[in-house]
């Protein structure tokens, strides 16, 4: 809030561009280029040619001294509900009329509003939660989540989550994402 107030003293709202740090990554930005600068994809990017979509955010590190944070957040809130949902929206959205931030935002909101809502019995069929255990990463030993600093020894906080979602629109009807 303080940063917003400081920025608004110098710039008007239309001159301020807020972006999630994850969305600023080159790979994420390239999704829009891949989708909309290559017209060949438009006729193929739909339920008639795509059986399913998988979006991964893989990491080779653990929580890296963020035990207190992760114990209250977990992977679902840390990664899925913001970063990965935005990626899903970029992958599934319709072509924006322009690449203006407001227009892209409006198209991503349409996707998110089209996500099929789960009923209670849908959750066990469509959600997997897990934790990483001790092992190796890049040839080096790593501890499991329960052995990380500031993590409760009986914690059930997820460090891995997988969701199967559906977007109820003409393009993605019946395609699991």
Residue ranges and their predicted role:
Residues 2-177:
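Secretory/organelle targeting and membrane-embedding segments
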């Amino acid at each position: 809030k303080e940063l917003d107030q400081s920025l608004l003293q110098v710039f008007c709202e239309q001159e301020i561009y807020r972006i999630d740090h994850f969305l600023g990554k080159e790979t994420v930005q390239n999704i829009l280029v891949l989708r909309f600068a290559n017209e060949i994809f438009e006729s193929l990017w739909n339920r008639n040619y795509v059986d399913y979509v998988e979006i991964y955010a893989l990491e080779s590190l653990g929580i890296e001294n963020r035990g207190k944070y992760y114990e209250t957040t977990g992977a679902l809130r840390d990664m899925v509900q913001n970063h990965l949902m935005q990626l899903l929206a970029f992958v599934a959205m319709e072509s924006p009329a322009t690449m203006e931030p407001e227009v892209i935002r409006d198209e991503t909101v349409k996707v998110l509003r089209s996500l099929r809502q789960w009923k209670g019995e849908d959750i066990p069929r469509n959600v997997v939660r897990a934790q990483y255990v001790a092992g190796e990463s890049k040839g080096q030993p790593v501890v499991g989540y329960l052995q990380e600093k500031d993590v409760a020894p009986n914690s059930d906080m997820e460090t891995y989550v997988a969701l199967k979602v559906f977007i109820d629109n003409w393009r993605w009807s019946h395609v699991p994402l």
